[in-house]
């Protein structure tokens, strides 16, 4: 597990500025942009992204779809739809884990060596950040333990408080 954890990076900043093979967009089911990171990615990528997204016919919660990066430094955008928090008894944890797994599978299938994730579902979808970060780090580390690609996974955090949650989640996994 420690080798997988060595491939994880924590970054505080703007995901739209990262020069990686793919960034992950915390999208809605329509894939047509919205608030938070979704809106920021759509604005930074340009109108061409919306045109391509319209052709994808949406995305189910827990699934992922891939587009070009257009005006972003990233070659690709992987769009995944996280669950809306409903108290934790409606399969939210499994759906959130599926977002990370599906995104990593698409990244590997498209030869992405580096992938950056936002904190999926923790904004307007109200998923508790401490739980979400544990699921994110746990799922990603399990997937990359078994696969060579992507080589590097970045958790791109909007603020230092969120970055600290990711650092603690990684440290907890290192301890076992």
UniProtKB/Swiss-Prot annotation:
SMART domains: A1pp (SM00506). GO terms for molecular function: O-acetyl-ADP-ribose deacetylase activity. Residues 1-174 form the Macro domain. InterPro entries: Macro_dom, Macro_dom-like. It comes from the Bacteria. Belongs to the MacroD-type family. This is Macro domain-containing protein mll7730.
């Amino acid at each position: 597990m420690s080798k997988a954890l060595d491939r994880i990076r924590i970054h505080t900043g703007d995901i739209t500025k990262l020069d990686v093979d793919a960034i992950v967009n915390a999208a809605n089911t329509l894939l047509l942009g919205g608030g938070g990171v979704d809106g920021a990615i759509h604005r930074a990528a340009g109108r061409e992204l919306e045109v391509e997204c319209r052709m994808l016919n949406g995305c189910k919660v827990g699934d992922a779809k891939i587009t070009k990066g257009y005006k972003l430094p990233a070659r690709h955008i992987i769009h995944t739809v996280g669950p809306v928090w409903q108290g934790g008894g409606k399969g939210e944890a499994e759906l959130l884990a599926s977002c990370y797994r599906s995104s990593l599978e698409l990244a590997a299938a498209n030869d992405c060596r580096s992938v950056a994730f936002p904190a999926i579902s923790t904004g307007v979808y109200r998923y508790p950040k401490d739980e979400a970060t544990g699921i994110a780090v746990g799922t990603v580390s399990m997937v990359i333990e078994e696969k060579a690609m992507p080589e590097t996974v970045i958790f791109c955090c909007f603020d230092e408080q969120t970055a600290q949650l990711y650092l603690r989640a990684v440290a907890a996994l290192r301890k076992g």
